[in-house]
């Protein structure tokens, strides 16, 4: 493998340890294509998520893009926010919770801000899979949730409009190690190939 690819034996060994043990697999690994990605609709609730986002965009409903303050959460928020702007939705805001006063995950403070600002939909990225009570609280304020997470769920899944998480036991998506941002990418990829190319 090292000789065929003209790479160091150390790198070749790392590839083999990760199941990339042929030249064909290595070439695919080093030159990935969008065509190699799994169908986003294999993820549980994806159709519901797409329908709700389309409804919000069509009605110019205010959307809050919400994510944790770590790298995964921030990149997910940046990506989904930019994507929604690219498809023409301008009635947007984003929210990253304060790490010291709110901590990780969905916060009551963030939900209250969304309600005050007239937000009808929160897209939560890299968080929310265990926010059962907070999703119920948001609903009492007239705010819907789409959760795009990758953490292990608890026994009870939040009663959001859609809960996208490849680690759900009832999810048939073939790769359950996506990041939170990766789940957000899957949601965005369903709109237009032109916009997806620019991600």
Q: Model regions: which residues?
A:
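Short beta-alpha connecting loops at secondary-structure transitions
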Residues: 164-175
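N-terminal small/polar loop signature for handling phosphorylated ligands or for N-terminal nucleophile
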Residues: 44-157, 163-164
